[in-house]
């Protein structure tokens, strides 16, 4: 935040009337919401009044809620913040007062005021989600059904009075990274069929529907996917030391490690397959590879336990000569975007 302000001052000095036009700060969940009182604090240090700084903040910040789970709806104890960040604590109390004043002015019911309160009296804590919702210019979920949930349930009181603040922005990927860069062979095939405009106009890929029954195109597509799978297997052999031979079905689960994301369920399924193969219950089984890629939050000990558990299952399976010709497990090391490009291609 300090760097953003310094860069602005380099262009405009201490005239902050253009600040909101030139800067936009995205809050992904509530972890970075401290940027709101921090911006106000920095602007106040520069001589901007609290109300003017709050007005700027309301134009600069936008808030994305990714999940309604408590881990994404942080609360910070007032006693703790007063001890370690006294200025930030005072600014949050001021924002809470501003919110209460607006709620009275706009006729919020007592229930609505309680639901949107920044200072939660019963918990003696600040709600970072309600701070973001009050200040943010725009609020969005990351899928249509999720956006409806936050409007209907999570932030219903704010939505009832300020529906214009709420939008849906469906999570997605860019075709330039995840298709053109990650899979140049498939990009070349697509270019041959529909031209190159899909790089800038995503909807152009819809023209591929005309080729879903074209045997020649489908054959080339299968060849490309086979080539990319072979490239991935060779990369895994080089990076992980796990040799994968022959035609195998690839089951990949690559995402942040969390209990609700069901990696543990996949691990149970893998273990069940292993013991069924050992017992001779699966006579007609296509050789398969189960690939995991994930990281956990530093303090999420249960997630770390799941990672350890999955790796132990993989060690068991890959070391068994009875099954490792038909079933292989891989937990990739240092899973990142570059690795993901190879997996999804």
Model regions: which residues?
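A conserved ligand/cofactor-binding region detector
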Residues: 1-345
């Amino acid at each position: 935040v300090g760097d953003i302000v310094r860069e602005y001052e380099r262009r405009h000095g201490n005239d902050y009337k253009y600040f909101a036009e030139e800067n936009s700060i995205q809050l992904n969940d509530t972890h970075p919401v401290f940027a709101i009182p921090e911006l106000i604090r920095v602007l106040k240090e520069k001589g901007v009044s609290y109300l003017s700084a709050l007005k700027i903040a309301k134009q600069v910040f936008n808030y994305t809620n990714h999940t309604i789970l408590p881990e994404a709806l942080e609360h910070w104890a007032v006693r703790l913040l007063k001890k370690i960040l006294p200025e930030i604590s005072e600014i949050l109390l001021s924002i809470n007062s501003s919110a209460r004043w607006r709620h009275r002015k706009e006729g919020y019911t007592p229930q609505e005021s309680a639901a949107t309160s920044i200072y939660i009296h019963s918990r003696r804590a600040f709600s970072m989600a309600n701070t973001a919702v009050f200040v943010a210019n725009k609020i969005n979920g990351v899928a249509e059904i999720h956006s409806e949930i936050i409007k209907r349930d999570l932030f219903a009181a704010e939505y009832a009075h300020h529906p214009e603040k709420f939008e849906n922005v469906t999570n997605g990927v860019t075709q330039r990274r995840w298709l053109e860069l990650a899979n140049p062979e498939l990009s070349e095939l697509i270019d041959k069929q529909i031209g190159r405009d899909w790089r800038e106009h995503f909807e152009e890929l819809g023209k591929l529907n005309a080729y879903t029954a074209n045997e020649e195109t489908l054959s080339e597509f299968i060849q490309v996917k086979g080539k990319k799978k072979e490239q991935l297997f060779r990369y895994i052999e080089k990076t992980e030391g796990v040799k994968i031979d022959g035609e195998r079905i690839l089951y990949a689960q690559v995402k942040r490690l969390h209990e609700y994301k069901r990696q543990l369920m996949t691990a149970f399924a893998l273990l069940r397959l292993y013991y069924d193969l050992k017992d001779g219950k699966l006579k007609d089984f296509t050789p398969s590879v189960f690939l995991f890629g994930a990281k956990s939050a530093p303090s999420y000990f249960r997630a770390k336990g799941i990672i350890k558990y999955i790796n132990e299952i993989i060690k068991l399976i890959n070391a068994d000569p009875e099954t490792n010709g038909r079933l292989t497990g891989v937990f990739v090391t240092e899973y990142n975007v570059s690795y993901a490009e190879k997996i999804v291609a």
